[in-house]
Amino acid sequence: MGKDKKDRKHKGGLTEDILEKNVTKPSKRVKHRRERQADSVESFVEEKLSKKILEQARQQQDELMEEYGFRKTGDRKTLKSAQTTLGTPDLDRIDDDDEDDSDDGASMTSETYYENVEVDEEEEKAFEMFMSQEAPTRRTLADVIMEKIQDKKTEIESHMSEQSTAPQMDERLVKVFKGVGEILKKYRSGKLPKAFKFIPSLTNWEEVLFITEPDEWSAAALFQATKIFVSNLNAKMAQRFFNLVLLPRIQDDIAEYKRLNYHLYMALKKALFKPAAFFKGILLPMCESGNCSLREAIIISSVLAKTTIPVLHSSAVILKIAEMNYSGANSIFLRTLFDKKYALPYRVIDAAVYHFLRFLTDKRTLPVLWHQCLLTFVQRYKEDISSEQKEALMELCRVHVHDKITPEVRRELVHSKSRDMETDQPMEST
């Protein structure tokens, strides 16, 4: 026995014995403690940051609504209490395909976004003097839809007479899109029907769109539709949507309520994401019609003033408006575009100068808007006009005089350089 005890040896070293036993490892315990501590700190930081982010977002929202006239300053407490009672949104209801359907949640608390436009009666009378007397009758959105329906009936009758084998739209699809139209009539917020989102991808999207009766949509539905069509249509198709659906609805709303609904105003801002389609589908048709009202021009120009527009598109639309027959709305739009202070090509500047010089032989009393537009142009581009053009503008100031504005125009012209003076300076000999 003693020999056995003497010969008995450890199977392994001390390290192996320790590893084989269930000994607590302090390093792991410390690690877990550190992880729990980090989790608590992270959760505390996230909660703290969340409160700061929400507070800053609420402050920015209040500032924006005060700036745009969405509500008065005294309503801040009411709005804050209303927001706290609403709670957090249900994220499960948000569809991945939606483009921020609820990003304008504050809009649901008010019916209109743009406040009443104060219009001077005398200025409005002077404005109407320059409106086209032969302007075509303005069409409402309902008129456009009825015209489309009549054209479709004529097309179907012609196909039937020619015994065409072209497939017609399935009655089940017609029923589906009519149901979509019924939903859009009562739409306020939330997700749109998925069938509606497929319309821009259809070849006959225009026909399908008018099945939903856009003239009956709510303003919120039209805003969401504008977002979808701007994102999924090319410039030419978007121009059709703006001209046939958005523009008549905006004109009807302004004519009826003397102001523009908030959602329609935001739809205009969203439409400017495609500037070429916006100008060709909304702005230029309003100028060409000759019957654009003063309120319409002021509201549309406010959208232009608050949105960044590419220089080339701005130059093109200034050139087009300058070459049109004059109406009061032209002065408002030109003044807004001049105020952006873009570096315009000389061709556009020359067209703007000749736009004003056309009134040298006009004996009518020009509205204040025209004088304001001239002053803005001279202030921004006085050094980009030639000396001959400057002399012609000085002569124009003698023909059409405004007590307060014309002296400012003269002062800007006198105390400025001309573009040809800069090029005619002799080069210094080296």
From Swiss-Prot:
Its main location: nucleus. It is found in: Nucleus, Nucleolus. Residues 93-104 have a biased composition (Acidic residues). One of its GO terms (cellular component) is nucleolus. Residues 68-78 have a biased composition (Basic and acidic residues). The keyword 4Fe-4S does not apply. Residues 1-45, 65-113 are annotated as: Disordered. GO terms for biological process: rRNA processing. Required for processing of 20S pre-rRNA precursor and biogenesis of 40S ribosomal subunits. PANTHER family: BYSTIN. This is Bystin. It comes from Nematostella vectensis.
